[in-house]
Curated annotation (Swiss-Prot):
Family: Belongs to the amidase family. GatA subfamily.
GO biological process, one term: translation
Assembly: Heterotrimer of A, B and C subunits.
Keyword Nucleotide-binding annotated: yes
Molecular function as annotated in GO: ATP binding; glutaminyl-tRNA synthase (glutamine-hydrolyzing) activity
Active site: K79 (charge relay system), S154 (charge relay system), S178 (acyl-ester intermediate)
Official protein name in the record: Glutamyl-tRNA(Gln) amidotransferase subunit A
Length: 491
């Protein structure tokens, strides 16, 4: 069996049986990481020595008969906007290039308590603002399927690392599609949970009412396992829901016969939707129908208003969140400034990249006294209407289905001079964040050029179990997940 296609449960069985040790497993993934990294640039920081030491400690604990967590010995990667105690957290920005957090984020703390082993921090668009992982201060990440193409963003490093086999699974964050779009582009599974299902404590904030942490993995079952570990209430995050955490893997094997799957009309009629993507997702919908699901066309009339709404709300929240970076307490500080005001202005001008500066300016404008009613408040009203459209749709269906992205991974640099084209790549994912719903991207095919295509399934609030059930049943029937970008990997 090709070990790059193995699931968390299969690795766990081999670790428990002694067929492979945690140290051997970590070494295998580090070897693959080191071989693929020159062509991918998926990592900002590789923690090889720390990973090997932790893996050896877990092997000793296993040999001593100690109880171990469900992820014991498994090599994991973390998006570099999640704080990791003692390990740099840069947000791929010059502003935080030397920042080493004195504390651990809730989600990473839960991963380490479950036995996970950190192999590195992954590259992202600066402060998670982008859709291609090209705005990183540490260089762009490439797509493992074709290194002339982008991996998506902003969690492109996390998606590329899983696709390349540099780790068993990874974490990302999703503000407008930043888990699902890279998952689609890189041919892996990516889940954005319900807003508040997973703690944001220790996630460096971009847009606080939209940000959500979620997992990438090679299969739906693996994503369910990771969600089981990171989900749940957190008193340190007031937006984290005090909701019971179900066993997400319990219903994976159940038939979807009789479930109603809604195909959102506005998504399949969207301007700019690649015909190959549309055909692949429609064929996947037909496969769900063959499994016993009932397909229903539904309408979300304000779905296409999501882009305009998002690009008022998200930059507005970003301009407030990023105001803390002033060159005083931490982060980059410009030298030889003639005054405090000049130091702050120069620190931001020198340390923030062009896209981050653009979004701060948009947000500051939208929140200014003369325009807050016309832009920000109106955007919040439209956001409510978008959520009501979803509420209406879920009265007649169990899950919703769309393409994840309008196209396959585009070529590196293709949208460098056209921010609007870059923003439109999130057309099909953004409304889900505005509504706070859970959604998953599952590989559903390939283009003629050999690039992955993703299908997005959207669930109702806190209905991740149903979402994962449908995704798993499709995945098992389609077997698309078994493919890997072999050309980008070492044997």
């Amino acid at each position: 069996m090709d070990r790059r296609d193995m699931t968390i449960s299969a690795w766990r069985q081999q670790l428990q049986s002694g067929e492979v040790s945690s140290r051997e497993l970590v070494d295998q993934h580090l070897k693959r990481l080191e071989s693929s990294e020159p062509s991918l640039n998926a990592f900002v920081e590789v923690t090889a020595d720390q990973a090997r030491a932790e893996a050896s400690r877990i092997d000793e604990a296993r040999a001593a008969g100690e109880a171990l967590g469900p992820l014991a010995g498994l090599p994991l990667a973390i998006k570099d906007n999640l704080c990791t105690k003692g390990v740099r957290t840069t947000c791929s920005s010059r502003m935080l290039e030397q920042f080493v957090p004195p504390y651990e984020s809730t989600v990473t703390e839960r991963l380490w308590q479950a036995g996970g082993v950190l192999v590195g921090k992954t590259n992202l668009d600066e402060f998670a603002m982008g859709g291609s992982t090209e705005t990183s201060a540490f260089g762009a990440t490439q797509n493992p399927w074709n290194t002339a193409h982008v991996p998506g963003g902003s969690s492109g490093g996390s998606a590329a690392a899983v696709a390349a086999g540099s780790c068993v699974a990874s974490l990302g964050s999703d503000t407008g599609g930043s888990i699902r779009q890279p998952a689609s582009f890189c041919g892996v599974v990516g889940l954005k949970p319900t807003y508040g299902r997973v703690s944001r404590w220790g996630l460096v904030a971009f847009a606080s009412s939209l940000d959500q942490v979620g997992p990438f993995a090679g299969s739906v079952a693996d994503v369910a396992e990771l969600l089981q570990v990171i989900a749940g209430p957190d008193p340190r995050d007031s937006t984290c829901l005090d909701a019971a955490v179900p066993v997400f893997s319990d219903g994976l094997s159940q038939s979807i016969k009789g479930l109603k799957v809604g195909l959102i009309k506005e998504c399949f009629d969207a301007e700019g939707l690649d015909p190959e993507v549309k055909a692949s997702v429609q064929a996947s919908a037909a496969q769900l129908e063959a499994l016993g699901a009932e397909l229903v066309e539904v309408s979300c009339p304000r779905f296409n208003d999501g882009i305009a709404t998002y690009y008022v709300i998200a930059p507005s929240e970003a301009s407030a969140n990023l105001a803390r970076y002033d060159g005083v307490k931490y982060g980059f500080r410009a030298e030889d400034a003639e005054s405090l005001a000049a130091m702050t202005a120069r620190s931001r001008a020198e340390a923030f990249g062009a896209e981050v500066q653009r979004r701060i300016l948009i947000g500051t404008y939208a929140l200014s006294a003369g325009y807050v009613d016309a832009y920000y408040k109106k955007a919040q009203q439209v956001r409510t209407l978008i959520r009501r459209d979803f509420d209406a749709a879920f009265k007649s269906v169990d899950v919703l289905l769309t393409p994840t992205a309008p196209s396959t991974a585009f070529k590196a640099g293709a949208h460098a001079d056209d921010p609007l084209a870059m923003y439109l790549a999130d057309l099909l994912t953004i409304p889900v964040n505005l509504a706070g719903l859970p959604a998953i991207s599952v590989p559903c095919g390939f283009s003629a050029a050999g690039l992955p295509i993703g299908m997005q399934l959207i669930g109702n609030v806190l209905d991740e179990p149903r979402l994962l059930q449908v995704a798993h049943q499709y995945e098992q029937a389609a077997q698309v997940f078994a493919s890997r970008p072999e050309a980008a990997l070492v044997p």
